[in-house]
Amino acid sequence: MKVFMGFDPGTKGFVSMIAEDGSFIKAEPIFRDIKVVDMIETANRLLAFVEGYEVRHVVIEDVHALYGSSAKGTFTFGYNSCVPEFFCAIAGLPYTKIP
């Protein structure tokens, strides 16, 4: 089945999938535990998420840290927001970042 994916890498982070006709297929958190990000486990979960589907294109929200956020919070947010882009690169999926 040909599908499209979308990533919202915000505070909680979610990934969703729709069919070519726009019908909803599924959605789930990007990270099992946002406070303890295990990149291997996250990559395996995302690979399982797309298994059996032909992903035509991925849209990733281009998010930015909030003004006045702590350095640690901004660094963590930036780290986590790169995960969807890295996943697409590793999985060979075409993607577009949108504001």
Which residues are covered by each model-predicted region?
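Phosphate- and other anionic-substrate recognition elements at nucleic-acid/protein interfaces
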Residues: 1-99
